[in-house]
A protein has these predicted regions:
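Extended hydrophobic leader/signal-anchor segments used for secretion and membrane insertion
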Residues: 1-139
Length: 139
């Protein structure tokens, strides 16, 4: 299912909940919260509860689902990492919601607050199912 960027619900954007999650991660604690948007469907949907573990950009791998602060401070996002580069001594990530067509603006390493442990495992399971179905169709 593809969604237009305009129809995608924001994840914790501008809410006090996002600030609480950020504070928990900054203290070194894992944070659990209910996702409000559909930008990561079908892997993570509205109402799903995710666990986010503190992580720096250096710890992040391509394919991880990361929780980060928007560069303008207007809220927080939970999206998948498409690529990661180390340039001029700093990390830069490209992220995108699974259900969105458009890419997110570049994410600076210092915007990254954590990695979803829940969403990451579900995402791997989803990709594994696609591989199995694809193999069965080709065989």
């Amino acid at each position: 299912m593809q969604m237009d960027e305009q129809n995608a619900a924001e994840v914790l954007s501008g809410s006090e909940a996002g600030q609480l999650v950020e504070a928990a991660l900054a203290s070194g604690a894992d944070a659990r919260f209910e996702v409000g948007g559909a930008s990561m469907a079908p892997t993570i949907g509205p109402g799903d509860v995710v666990t986010v573990r503190p992580a720096s950009a250096e710890d992040i791998r391509v394919g991880d689902v990361v929780f980060y602060r928007r560069s303008d401070g207007s809220g927080h996002v939970l999206h998948r990492v498409l690529w990661k580069r180390h340039t001029a001594g700093k990390w830069v990530l490209r992220t995108k919601g699974d259900a969105l067509r458009s890419l997110d603006p570049l994410v600076a390493g210092d915007q990254v607050l954590g990695r979803s442990t829940t969403g990451a495992s579900r995402a791997r399971a989803w990709r594994g199912l696609i591989r199995v179905c694809g193999y069965a169709a080709v065989s």
